[in-house]
A protein has these predicted regions:
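Extracytoplasmic electron-transfer domains, predominantly the class I c-type cytochrome c fold
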Residues: 69-122, 129-132, 136, 194-240, ...
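Sequence/structural segment immediately N-terminal to covalent heme-attachment motifs in c-type
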Residues: 36-56, 160-186, 193-198, 251
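Short, non-ligating residues that shape and space the ligands of small metal-coordination modules
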Residues: 59-60, 186-187, 245
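Extended surface/linker regions that mediate inter-domain or inter-protein docking
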Residues: 121-169, 183, 254
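N-terminal secretory signal peptides that target proteins for export/translocation
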Residues: 1-7
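Bacterial N-terminal signal peptides
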Residues: 11-20
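His/Cys-centered metal/cofactor-coordination and adjacent catalytic loops
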Residues: 25-38, 52, 56-87, 143-161, ...
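Electrostatic cytochrome c docking/interface patches
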Residues: 25-46, 143-173, 262-271, 281-295
Length: 296
């Protein structure tokens, strides 16, 4: 009898000793290059830097959150913090409707989200950012049942030509981009005032004349990804099933010409044509609409 009790005690002690190892094994980890992010360390960082906007539970309603519409003339204050519970992310390299990769989340921390209150966290270490990614993924059950999508393939950018810009202009009309973004890309299309996000909150189309940076990056490569993956949670869809990959580059080239206040190879080439020069001149005369925002 005594031997049996001793055996039970030994088993109990073994279970207790193993418990921390079991908990540790259940911790979420991320892998960014050669760096492994850990949920526990990320939790401490989140409640130091992030919860004020994203909330104690990660649902995007922290004490610093400003309700949509509070400042109608400020596109920057009208961008809601990301709801990590919903796990719907705009900036991804993966197809629409899928979860982003760890690298996608990490890149958002490095880059920040342009035209929003989300800053770049480049001041943190690589390890810190990897840890934050690990903790952010604990808020939604989606990460337990779904895998991240497979990043889309971005073909090499073809040579910039007047023909590619002209074809992009035709696609802009054919795909009805103008209905939201307006014929000159000023964010004032006929549908602009009716747009809402996944929370049924008003959202503004991107105004190309307002700058050269996009929420998810600044390069042509970034713009291509936005067009082919869409911005989930917003009215901006993916056109991956509508347009050929190489043709998408033509649209990228044309969209750059709509950024009339930013010098770019695309704008310079377009200005060299009679049609392009007249269009750009007219856009500059018209100017940026008052209060036109860049939520998307």
């Amino acid at each position: 009898m005594r031997k049996m009790n001793i055996s039970k005690c030994l088993v109990g002690i073994a279970v207790l000793l193993a418990a921390p190892m079991i908990v540790l094994a259940q911790q979420t980890e991320t892998h960014i290059g050669k760096v492994t992010g850990h949920e526990g360390a990320g939790r401490q960082l989140y409640f130091r830097y992030c919860w004020g906007c994203h909330g104690f539970r990660g649902n995007g309603n922290g004490e610093n959150w400003i309700p949509t519409g509070s400042f109608p003339d400020s596109p920057y204050l009208n961008v809601e913090p990301r709801n990590f519970v919903a796990a719907t992310f705009e900036c991804r390299s993966t197809p629409t409707g899928t979860l982003p990769t760890d690298e996608d989340l990490y890149n958002s921390l490095v880059r920040g989200l342009v035209n929003s209150n989300m800053p770049s966290w480049v001041t943190l270490t690589t390890q810190n950012r990897a840890d934050l990614v690990a903790f952010i993924k604990t808020f939604s059950a989606r990460w337990k049942t779904e895998k991240a999508g497979t990043p889309i393939t971005v073909p090499p950018e073809p040579a910039l030509t007047v023909q590619s810009i002209q074809h992009g202009k035709e696609l802009f009309t054919k795909l009805e981009c103008w209905k939201c973004h307006g014929p000159e890309g000023l964010g004032d299309g006929p549908s602009a005032s009716t747009l809402t996000d996944s929370n049924d909150e008003p959202i503004r189309p991107y105004n190309f004349s307002a700058g050269y940076r996009f929420k998810c990056g600044t390069s042509n490569h970034d713009l291509y990804k936005i067009f082919m993956t869409g911005l989930d949670g917003t009215p901006m869809p993916s056109f991956a099933d509508v347009i050929k990959p190489d043709d998408a580059w033509d649209l990228v080239h044309y969209l750059r010409t709509l950024q009339v206040y930013h010098k770019s190879p695309e704008l310079a080439l377009w200005m060299g044509t009679k049609e392009g020069a007249e269009i750009v001149k007219a856009e500059k005369v018209r100017g940026t609409p008052t209060g036109s925002g860049v939520n998307q």
